[in-house]
Amino acid sequence: MMEALAERLSALQDRILELYEADSKDLKDQIEHWKCVRQECAVLYKAREVGFSHLNHQVVPSLTVSRAKAHKAIEVQLALESLQNSEYNNEEWTLQDASLEMWHTEPKGCFKKTGVPVTVLFDCDKDNTMEYVLWGHIYVWGDNGWVKTFGEADNWGLHYTVAGEKVYYVQFYEDAKKYGHGNGNGDGYEWEVHVGGTVMHYSDSVSSATHCDKLPTVEIVSGLQHINPSPPPANPSAKENVWSSPAKRVRRSDSGGDPVRALDGKSRSVLCGSAHNNATGSSGDSDYTPIVHLKGESNCLKCLRFRLGKHKHLYINISSTWRWANHASEKAIVTVTFANELQRQQFLNTVKIPSTVTLSQGVMTV
């Protein structure tokens, strides 16, 4: 039985990685992806049920974990299959559009596309900010099936309208109570909303959501052509694709020093710490080793790590999947270490990284 389960698991994981690498925009392929994920969970569940702790050198998760992952896969698969029967089935649907992370991003239980960042300054303080995502296209399940609408922003929050009903998926007042100071009596909060080239200000004793009908609104329609984009951030640590992440808290810095700068997947230089390159391509300090962080969905990274076993001569060590404990994102990370930067460059030139995986470079102490 172990051999049969191992062969089935290997075939499913190979197919999943093929779908990641193909980066298809066909809804049928996204449905197939989630079918494979569901079947993978079923194989792992069966393996654990009969007492196997490892399969294909992979740790078999507990029954509870496999069951929970299968339920999530079924949820997304059924939603996509119902979308396949709608008028929106011929639109472009990427793996990211159909990902579990996107499904659980606010507004939850909806499909979203074409997001832009919205920055809110609580107390109108640039050091006390929160970032949100305003979606250009939102697909909402209603009484008559899927309905496509668009996101809107006003001083009160982010919302969409379906069947004449305005639905807020972010209310700034709720976060103002958490992060703002107000007047100390539970009101008197103020904030600024920055979206595209528009700035909206709110300052009042906020006590009722009825205020929102009186506030100006910014609409995001058809690829955001109604808003002039903001200039790119000067801070090199800022992410370009802010819209693809859930809202993230930006806290005040306790020190005046610059943070360690993250590198994007296109960067080929090390900007982290005090390590410098010498003529041999090695780190100037023997205590530092070049690394690559691979960030993406846990299942994709596990399949990729399995494939990287064929390229062991191109790296020194590779970690298991891990996550930041205090990070809101569900994305997992795999870290790869190298003997020197020349080996890392050979790795980058040889290994094909799926487009759904984010690659960043840096160094770490050893």
From Swiss-Prot:
Chain intervals for the UniProt region annotation (DNA-binding domain): 289-366
GO biological process, one term: viral DNA genome replication
Protein family: Belongs to the papillomaviridae E2 protein family.
Protein's UniProt keywords contain Cytoplasm: no
Protein known as: Regulatory protein E2
Role played: Plays a role in the initiation of viral DNA replication. A dimer of E2 interacts with a dimer of E1 in order to improve specificity of E1 DNA binding activity. Once the complex recognizes and binds DNA at specific sites, the E2 dimer is removed from DNA. E2 also regulates viral transcription through binding to the E2RE response element (5'-ACCNNNNNNGGT-3') present in multiple copies in the regulatory regions of the viral genome. Activates or represses transcription depending on E2RE's position with regards to proximal promoter elements including the TATA-box.
Annotated HAMAP family: PPV_E2
Stretches the record annotates as Transactivation domain: 1-207
Principal location: host cell
Pfam families associated with the record: PPV_E2_C, PPV_E2_N
Domain of life assignment: Viruses
Keywords annotated in UniProt: Activator, DNA replication, DNA-binding, Early protein, Host nucleus, Isopeptide bond, Phosphoprotein, Repressor, Transcription, Transcription regulation, Ubl conjugation
Gene3D superfamilies found in the cross-reference section: 3.30.70.330, E2 (early) protein, N terminal domain, subdomain 1, Papillomavirus E2 early protein domain
Species of provenance: Macaca mulata papillomavirus 1 (Rhpv 1)
InterPro entries linked to this entry: E2/EBNA1_C_sf (IPR035975), Nucleotide-bd_a/b_plait_sf (IPR012677), Papillomavirus_E2_C (IPR000427), PPV_E2_N (IPR001866), Reg_prot_E2 (IPR033668), Regulatory_protein_E2_N (IPR036050), Regulatory_protein_E2_N_1 (IPR042503), Regulatory_protein_E2_N_2 (IPR042504)
Cellular component terms (Gene Ontology): host cell nucleus
Subcellular location: Host nucleus
Positions of crosslink type Glycyl lysine isopeptide (Lys-Gly) (interchain with G-Cter in SUMO): K295
Positions of region (Disordered): 224-261
Keyword DNA-binding: yes
Residues that span the membrane, as ranges: none
